[in-house]
Amino acid sequence: MPQDLSNPTECLKAQFAAGSLHHGLLFLGQRLPSVERQAMELTRSILGIPQEQNLHPDLFHLRPSGKARIITVEKTRELIGELNRSSNQGGAKIALIHEADRMRKEAANAFLKTLEEPPGDTYVFLLTTRPYSMLPTIRSRCLQVRLKGEPDSEKCEEWQEWLKTYEGWIHGLLDRESLKKDRVSPVFAAYGLTAGLLKIIREQADQQCEKVLRELPQILDDKEKDALETGIRKGVRSDFLRQLSQKTRSIAVEDSKNLET
């Protein structure tokens, strides 16, 4: 069963200090940047990396790359080779596998033995927002840590204002008498809402990309960078659409209750 923790780092740090930290952790969350930040916080503690730094000779990253945004078996084998070498600093080694759900079946199978029997003092942190897109054999060999976190979009004032306008628009559509008098205005309002939504998503995605790329713990090649940006933009869009779906559902439920009373 996944651990359900709003901030797991203190608990996991204590497990590491006690020598009981599981060698394979699967970090689950709704937003990859948030998952990565919390996994990196634990990584810094284990490897003794200062807060303002992200690099360490015993820290290795594996990311999707290319237009297909996949983790290839070739890159996976390179990581396995690094983990099987002696520690550069004489301590622990950590592998961060970003968007682990993007591992191709061949890559996941190649990594399975390392996950089952990792080299001594080696930890593997798999990060994902889509755990059920991973091979069950990979998931079952990890301690799952479910992370809670408020999406950045919920802090966006422009988005909150948009939701208020959207709610008013929906209520207007549900008002049959008002709709009989004016069927044109709601159509034009829909165009405005759509344009506003696309603008907010684009701006939030741009900000998230800039922030993540600025904080990257390593220099990426162009294929990895393109894959990362694509993943961030898809994640931001999915987050907004998820909230929009929830808002629409809550309005419909509220309206049905009002009809019953």
Where are these regions (language model features)?
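Conserved alpha-helical scaffold flanking the Walker A/P-loop in AAA+ ATPase domains
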Residues: 10-16, 73-94, 102, 106-113
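Structural motif
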Residues: 94-96, 125
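Conserved catalytic segments around the Walker B and adjacent sensor/switch elements
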Residues: 50-64
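Flexible beta-alpha connector loops of hexameric P-loop NTPases
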Residues: 67-73
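Residues immediately C-terminal
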Residues: 102-103, 117, 133
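Short loop/turn elements that form and flank the Walker-type P-loop nucleotide-binding site
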Residues: 20-21, 55-57, 88-91, 118-121
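Charged, glycine-rich active-site and insertion segments that engage polyanionic ligands
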Residues: 1-33, 37-52, 120-123, 128-261
